[in-house]
Amino acid sequence: AELQMELETKEINYRQSSNLQGVIMENISQEYAARLHGNQLNPYSQCITRENNSTIWTIKTLNEEAYENIIMPLSECTDIFLRKKGLSISVCNKRMHLKNDNELITEFYEKKCPKYLEIKFQTPTAFKSDGKYVIYPDLGLIYASLMRKYSAVSEAFDMFDEETLGALVEQSEIVRYR
């Protein structure tokens, strides 16, 4: 599931992601927040972007439990409060998009894919490897993260496999990075 909230502000950008993480935690149950803090892999992601001169906060969840515990409470918000900045921000528009497991699996396995993919990261991205953060693109870390997330939400498939990961990395290359 995906929730996009148009925020009535020009004052925040991707650097406030940790503050928005706090907004999520303040709007979900304490019990679920505690469970999330114990997870190695979060069942959601969030980012802030600028689109057509608007500030958009996007929250995506990977399973029904995260949808019910994160997106549903946030979809009720008419404003958010950034505690560290002491800033109250109105939510002026919301859009929700839902896909069920079958739609995702069909899209993943049946949709034709071009030979070359262009991936654009909308916010700074880092991966943890050997206890350190890696800020440069590393195909092994990108693929492993995607495989783990897919496995975490799929009851039918365990996607993570060292042999498959090795083959993906071997058959891929980063041709441009900026």
What spans do the regions from the language model cover?
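RNA-interacting cores
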Residues: A1-R178
